[in-house]
C-alpha cells in the first residue's frame, strides 16, 4: 500500500482514481498532477516505483493544499465568517443551509431529525 501525504492509497485501483482518496484532490486535479509528473493515469498503484511516488509527493506538496492544511483552512474560514457575523456565518452558527437553499421543506441534513411539536395536528374531515 503506497502512502502519499499521510493517506494510504488502495493498491488495486488506477492511479487516477486512487489519488482522489486524498482530501483536496478530485478527478481533475489527479489528472493534472499525473500529466505534470509524466506518470500514466492507467498505472495501478501497486505498479508505482519509488521514484514515481517521490515525484507525486513533491508535486502535490509544492502545488496544492491538501489533507490537514486544507481542513484547517476551511475550518478557519468558517470560524472567521461566524466571528464577523456575516450572513453565511449566522447560517453556520444556526446549523442551517449556507448557500441559499430552501428550508421550508428539505434541508434535513443541516437541520437534523424533525422535532415534532405537540398539539399541532391538522383537523380531520368529518
Swiss-Prot record:
A Pfam cross-reference name: Ribosomal_S13
Region entry Disordered, spans: 95-126
Entry keyword tRNA-binding: yes
Keyword Secreted applies: no
GO molecular function, one term: structural constituent of ribosome
InterPro entries hit by this protein: Rbsml_uS13_C, Ribosomal_uS13, Ribosomal_uS13-like_H2TH, Ribosomal_uS13_bac-type, Ribosomal_uS13_CS
Highest rank taxon of the organism: Bacteria
PROSITE patterns referenced in this protein's UniProt entry, alphabetically: RIBOSOMAL_S13_1, RIBOSOMAL_S13_2
Gene Ontology cellular component annotations, sorted alphabetically: cytosol; small ribosomal subunit
GO biological process, one term: translation
Protein task: Located at the top of the head of the 30S subunit, it contacts several helices of the 16S rRNA. In the 70S ribosome it contacts the 23S rRNA (bridge B1a) and protein L5 of the 50S subunit (bridge B1b), connecting the 2 subunits; these bridges are implicated in subunit movement. Contacts the tRNAs in the A and P-sites.
NCBIfam families: uS13_bact (TIGR03631)
HAMAP family (UniProt xref): Ribosomal_uS13 (MF_01315)
Subunit structure: Part of the 30S ribosomal subunit. Forms a loose heterodimer with protein S19. Forms two bridges to the 50S subunit in the 70S ribosome.
Family (UniProt): Belongs to the universal ribosomal protein uS13 family.
Protein name: Small ribosomal subunit protein uS13
Amino acid at each position: 500500500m503506497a502512502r502519499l501525504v499521510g493517506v494510504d492509497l488502495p493498491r488495486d485501483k488506477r492511479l487516477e482514481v486512487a489519488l482522489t482518496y486524498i482530501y483536496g484532490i478530485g478527478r481533475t486535479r489527479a489528472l493534472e498532477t499525473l500529466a505534470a509528473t509524466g506518470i500514466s493515469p492507467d498505472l495501478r498503484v501497486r505498479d508505482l516505483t519509488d521514484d514515481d511516488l517521490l515525484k507525486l509527493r513533491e508535486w502535490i506538496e509544492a502545488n496544492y493544499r491538501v489533507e490537514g492544511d486544507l481542513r484547517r483552512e476551511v475550518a478557519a474560514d468558517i470560524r472567521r465568517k461566524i466571528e464577523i457575523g456575516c450572513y453565511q456565518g449566522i447560517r453556520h452558527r444556526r446549523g442551517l443551509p449556507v448557500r441559499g437553499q430552501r428550508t421550508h421543506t428539505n434541508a434535513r441534513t443541516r437541520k437534523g431529525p424533525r422535532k415534532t411539536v405537540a398539539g399541532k395536528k391538522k383537523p380531520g374531515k368529518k
